[in-house]
């Protein structure tokens, strides 16, 4: 399944205006979609020479599927980082995601397996989608390499799945799709200020309350000296944290690098 699920994407040629007569009525383009009736792969990638010779519009019809697969891969990687031994995966983290997922298939949890099965379903049914994102060669990497916060994964994934309502992907329930946990926002403690206790009066009171003594000055010097820069971690762990985690809870796309 790993081989069929995690294939690299290729480019496809869009039907030109000359072939408009052969397009079925069901696949006619609207304002937000691009018609792509011929589903056979040419097997040839576009080169600069062909683009210069022909100025007709080209598209990447699998962009819709690639976006969904990217969202799933990020969630799978986050799941692996949370629930599995970090040191065990550090040596293999810079390999393709397919190798990591195939090795963890037998020891993964049920919800992670449901992600893999849904990925396989998306791979087998990508050609059933009639609405595709237009592809611009100057911004070809922005769609697949764009960092997406985990809080945005669920709504974007559901909006993408609604496009292909006719495929077997729609048989999955919302409970199976909503596996991304909501991040609970920490409630900030607020204090009501009376007329007598304004921020300026509190600041003046604290400033008067602390007299300038030698003890306080010595303590402040000791505290300043004790604040030494943290020791840098090992090279592997540093690269690991920089590459796969950040403060914004963004997981980089490993597959389409």
Swiss-Prot record:
Residue ranges of the DNA-binding region?
A: 58-132
- Chief location bin: nucleus
Keyword Transmembrane assigned to the entry: answer is: no
Query: What's an example GO cellular component term for this entry?
Result: nucleus
| Record flagged with keyword Transcription regulation | yes
Subcellular locations according to the entry:
Nucleus
Q: Which UniProt keywords apply?
A: Activator, DNA-binding, Nucleus, Transcription, Transcription regulation
- What are the start and end residues of every segment in region (Disordered)? 210-239
- What terms describe the molecular function in GO for this protein? DNA binding
Described purpose of this protein according to its UniProt entry:
Mating type proteins are sequence specific DNA-binding proteins that act as master switches in yeast differentiation by controlling gene expression in a cell type-specific fashion. Transcriptional activator that induces the transcription of a-specific genes.
Protein family according to the UniProt entry: Belongs to the MATA2 family.
| UniProt miscellaneous comment | There are three genetic loci for mating type genes in K.lactis. MAT is the expression locus that determines the mating type of the cell, whereas HML (containing HMLALPHA1, HMLALPHA2 and HMLALPHA3) and HMR (containing HMRA1 and HMRA2) represent silenced repositories of mating type information. The mating type is determined by the MAT locus, which contains either a copy of HML or of HMR. Diploid cells are usually heterozygous for the MAT locus.
Tell me the protein's name.
Mating-type protein A2
Its gene? MATA2
